């Protein structure tokens, strides 16, 4: 046994051992030593994008998963911990543009490197189940299910709005539009309507909302999904009109439809606003050049709802009027840049008096503001918006004719009934959630399995011809989709008529790839999308990932699961029973700012920090030139702030176990973790202490085999088993930081137990190693082997979890605080089962009491059981 802890050697030996015995390969219906089938547990981290290297967020996420998997395996569970790669997506195309390499080559190189990094972390991954979403054997099932959805009407085609770069002749993702311009060309971006494919996620809106209640997810995530789904009860109604198009027919059958949750304010409508693409806007623009120019300006704006909420609200009158459905008054129609054609009917009613956005719009364009809701004791003014203007809980209708005096619900009911009687409206539930547009005008993604034929139209690719394979040797140049320029891919034969045809060149949203990968892990070699093995493992018991995926990924995966269920592919409603969202990893930031305001960020490793007398940062200088840098505070590790820590460098210097120990000890899994170089050093020191104890006591521990602890070990055993009880509780709560604290207490107890027998040391260190093992498996494995535990039991991989010996927790003696005349003077040791009389006698006879009594007998002795004795003289 080495006298010094050498992480590299210890970790290499452990990993070679695990590889040799295929330690992490898992099978369904595994049985335990007793011959009984083990209960399954599926614990999975969200699969990473193969960006090139692991970052500390990855290390934290996967270590949490690994600790859980190893702990549960030792507790007799059949645990699945797989891994794969979310391999399609725009970063690979960007890398191809920058480096002139095919996205496929870049992606596969990154996968190989990151897999090697994961293996160096000692993760208990069953690599036989590895999945890469860019593999044709994987994405063929994306295509297969898409075609099934198309058959059932869940997938459909309609026009959608995209960002178009007129110079590069390509569609841009929202994040590629910077201040209204293309990120590469700098050209002003246009909005364009193009045919796209959508999935009817809105058909599942109520189920997606209702099923959240039964999930073991953080409340914060549930609320985020609830808000995104956004159930609204309101009234959809029409403003009639006589506006005719060039064909002489009424536009939209003479009705401008809107939806509102505030039908009680309908009598306060002073304008309507429509989207730039609305038929009324198009009609008005034909004879109004200024309006046509404004509409064109609107088309250059963002197509993101979030941007709509924050941008400046602009409008222009169309000159058109519609009729108020209840009063018969004429209402002006405006075009508003804040109205989206893709939301509802592409039109909204304007009630400036009781809607903050409409209020600001009306003030800007000098539109009428008509108060129709009053709250007792409040005075209305158009000088500034006040919160009570939008109050529906306390407001009553005024200036509303027959509805005056009605509260919110009564007014909505009455107004909805009157609109229905006129055939102009009805109560309706609407959703903020929109159908999922899955078409992407990009190369590196799942090809949409459709063929365009001049004779037959759009024709699905026959199932026997799946997968439609993506060519992997194309290098994007930034000018359009390379699939549209590759005749090998583009040109095909129509499966219906046999004539020459063209493949669809759009690819699928990469969120589709992550909708079901965790199911493919269960049966990666299946000849169908999933098989019976998926029924065994799913639903997943524990999902682990970042809060940034709280909405889209998790929502889409839930939807995809429900579609698979309805097609008879799975037997469960929800994919993820429990969810843990780990906190971000934070680090210090440092920068310099030039005269133009541009910041240059310095990595913390390249900075010297000066501290004051209290140890707080007082200043910082760059190591390169000794000149000051600004301390920017603690922020999430990121490339943009250059404050990341390279996990590989950390592992190379300290070993994987030190990295794992630090990220588990520094904070509870769900909370933010602040990076600390001194904390890493502390973790390394602790592991050296563990090794040193094993080395120093190696002979005693070996000699203790086959013998029982003695009475001299009672105090040590009591401490070990007391701490074990707490550690077990913390493991079950996924509070791994306090588990590490428990192991530190155990080591302290072992080091302090100078008189412990070989058996006592052997048992105590055995407990410590097993409690430590899920967190730092390499050193625990090495010491387990070196000290002979494996010969006596089994490999620590499958060693039984230590059981708390309740008898060891019972104390034969207890220590009481000893007071004389109410002041603490010392302590008193008495038998644990001593009665009051025995305690009083022991106290009266103690040397401490004798010293203060000076021969006088105690007047009274007060005993507080289990705590103290007070001798009154």
Curated annotation (Swiss-Prot):
Keywords: Aminoacyl-tRNA synthetase, ATP-binding, Cytoplasm, Ligase, Nucleotide-binding, Protein biosynthesis. ATP binds at residue 639. InterPro entries: aa-tRNA-synth_I_CS (IPR001412), aa-tRNA-synth_Ia (IPR002300), Leu-tRNA-ligase (IPR002302), Leu_tRNA-synth_edit (IPR025709), M/V/L/I-tRNA-synth_anticd-bd (IPR013155), Rossmann-like_a/b/a_fold (IPR014729), tRNAsynth_Ia_anticodon-bd (IPR009080), Val/Leu/Ile-tRNA-synth_edit (IPR009008). A motif ('KMSKS' region) lies at residues 636-640. One of its GO terms (molecular function) is aminoacyl-tRNA deacylase activity. A motif ('HIGH' region) lies at residues 48-58. Its EC number is 6.1.1.4. GO terms for biological process: leucyl-tRNA aminoacylation. It is an enzyme of class 6 (ligase). It catalyses: tRNA(Leu) + L-leucine + ATP = L-leucyl-tRNA(Leu) + AMP + diphosphate. One of its GO terms (cellular component) is cytosol. It is found in: Cytoplasm. HAMAP family: Leu_tRNA_synth_B. Belongs to the class-I aminoacyl-tRNA synthetase family. This is Leucine--tRNA ligase. It comes from Cupriavidus metallidurans (strain ATCC 43123 / DSM 2839 / NBRC 102507 / CH34) (Ralstonia metallidurans).
């Amino acid at each position: 046994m080495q006298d010094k802890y050498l992480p590299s050697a210890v970790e290499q030996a452990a990993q070679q051992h695990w590889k040799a015995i295929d330690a992490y390969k898992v099978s369904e219906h595994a049985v335990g030593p007793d011959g009984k089938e083990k209960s399954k547990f599926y614990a999975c981290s969200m699969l990473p994008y193969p960006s090139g290297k692991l970052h500390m967020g990855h290390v934290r996420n996967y270590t949490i998963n690994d600790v859980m998997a190893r702990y549960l395996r030792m507790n007799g569970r059949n645990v699945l911990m797989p891994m794969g790669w979310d391999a399609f997506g725009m970063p690979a195309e960007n890398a191809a543009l920058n480096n002139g390499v095919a996205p496929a080559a870049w992606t596969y190189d990154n996968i190989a490197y990151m897999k090697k990094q994961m293996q160096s972390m000692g993760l208990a991954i069953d690599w036989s189940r590895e999945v890469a979403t860019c593999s044709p054997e994987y994405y063929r099932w994306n295509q297969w299910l898409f075609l099934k959805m198309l058959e059932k009407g869940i997938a459909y085609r309609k026009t959608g709005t995209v960002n178009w770069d007129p110079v590069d002749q390509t569609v841009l993702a929202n994040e590629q539009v910077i201040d209204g311009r293309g990120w590469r060309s700098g050209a002003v971006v246009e909005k364009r309507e193009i045919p796209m494919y959508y999935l009817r996620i809105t058909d599942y809106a109520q189920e997606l909302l209702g099923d959240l209640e039964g999930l073991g997810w953080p409340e914060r995530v549930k609320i985020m999904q609830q808000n995104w789904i956004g159930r609204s009860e309101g009234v959809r109604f029409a403003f009639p009109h006589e506006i005719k198009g060039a064909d002489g027919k009424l536009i939209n059958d003479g009705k401008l439809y809107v939806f509102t949750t505030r039908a009680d304010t309908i009598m306060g409508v002073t304008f309507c606003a429509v989207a730039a693409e609305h038929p009324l806007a198009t009609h008005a623009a034909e004879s109004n050049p200024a309006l046509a120019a404004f509409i064109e300006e609107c088309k250059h704006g963002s197509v993101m709802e979030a941007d709509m909420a924050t941008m400046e609200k602009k409008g222009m009158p169309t000159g058109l009027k519609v009729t108020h459905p209840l009063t018969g008054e004429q209402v002006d129609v405006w075009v508003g840049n804040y109205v989206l054609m893709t939301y509802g009917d592409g039109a909204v009613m304007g009630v400036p008096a009781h809607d903050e956005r409409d209020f600001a719009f009306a003030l800007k364009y000098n539109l009428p503001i008509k108060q129709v809701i009053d709250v007792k004791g409040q005075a209305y003014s158009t000088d500034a918006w006040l919160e009570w203007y939008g109050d529906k809980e306390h407001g009553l209708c005024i200036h509303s004719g027959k509805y005056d005096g009605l509260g919110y619900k009564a007014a909505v009911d009455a107004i909805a009934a009157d609109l229905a009687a006129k055939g102009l409206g009805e109560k309706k539930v609407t959703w903020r959630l929109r159908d999922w547009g899955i078409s992407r005008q990009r190369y590196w993604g799942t090809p949409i399995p459709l063929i365009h034929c001049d004779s037959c139209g759009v024709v699905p690719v026959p199932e026997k011809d799946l997968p439609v394979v993506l060519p992997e040797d194309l290098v994007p140049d930034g000018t359009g989709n390379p699939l549209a320029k590759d005749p090998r891919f583009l040109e095909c034969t129509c499966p219906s008529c046999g004539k020459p045809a063209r493949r669809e060149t759009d690819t699928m949203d990469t969120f589709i790839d992550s909708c079901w990968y965790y199911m493919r892990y269960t049966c990666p070699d299946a000849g169908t999308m999933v098989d019976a093995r998926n029924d065994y493992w799913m639903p997943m018991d524990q999902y682990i990932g970042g809060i940034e995926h709280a909405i889209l990924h998790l929502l889409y995966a839930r939807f995809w699961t429900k579609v698979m269920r309805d097609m008879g592919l799975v037997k469960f409603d929800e994919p993820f029973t429990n969810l843990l969202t780990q906190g971000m990893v934070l680090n210090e930031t440092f920068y310099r700012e030039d005269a133009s305001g541009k910041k240059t960020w310095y990595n913390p490793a390249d900075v010297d920090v000066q501290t004051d007398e209290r140890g707080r940062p007082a200043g910082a200088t760059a190591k390169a030139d000794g000149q000051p840098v600004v301390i920017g505070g603690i922020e999430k590790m990121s490339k943009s702030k250059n404050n990341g820590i390279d996990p590989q460098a950390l592992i190379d210097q300290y070993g994987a176990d030190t990295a794992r120990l630090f990220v588990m000890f520094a904070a509870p899994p769900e909370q933010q973790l602040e990076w600390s170089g001194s904390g890493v050093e502390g973790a390394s020191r602790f592991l050296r202490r563990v090794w040193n104890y094993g080395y120093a006591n190696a002979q005693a521990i070996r000699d203790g085999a086959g013998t029982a602890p003695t009475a001299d070990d009672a105090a040590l055993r009591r401490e070990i088993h007391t701490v074990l009880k707490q550690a077990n509780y913390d493991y079950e709560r996924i509070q791994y930081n306090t588990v590490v604290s428990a192991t530190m207490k155990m080591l302290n107890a072992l080091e302090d137990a100078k008189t412990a027998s070989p058996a006592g040391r052997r048992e105590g260190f055995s407990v410590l190693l097993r409690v430590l093992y899920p967190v730092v498996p390499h050193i625990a494995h090495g010491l387990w082997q070196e000290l002979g535990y494996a010969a006596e039991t089994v490999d620590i991989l499958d060693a039984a979890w230590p059981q708390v010996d309740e008898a060891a927790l019972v104390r034969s003696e207890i220590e009481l605080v000893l007071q004389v005349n109410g002041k603490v003077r010392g302590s008193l040791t008495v038998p644990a089962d001593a009665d009051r009389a025995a305690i009083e006698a022991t106290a009266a006879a103690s040397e401490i009491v004798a010293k203060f009594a000076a021969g006088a007998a105690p007047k009274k002795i007060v005993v507080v059981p289990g705590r103290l004795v007070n001798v009154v003289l």
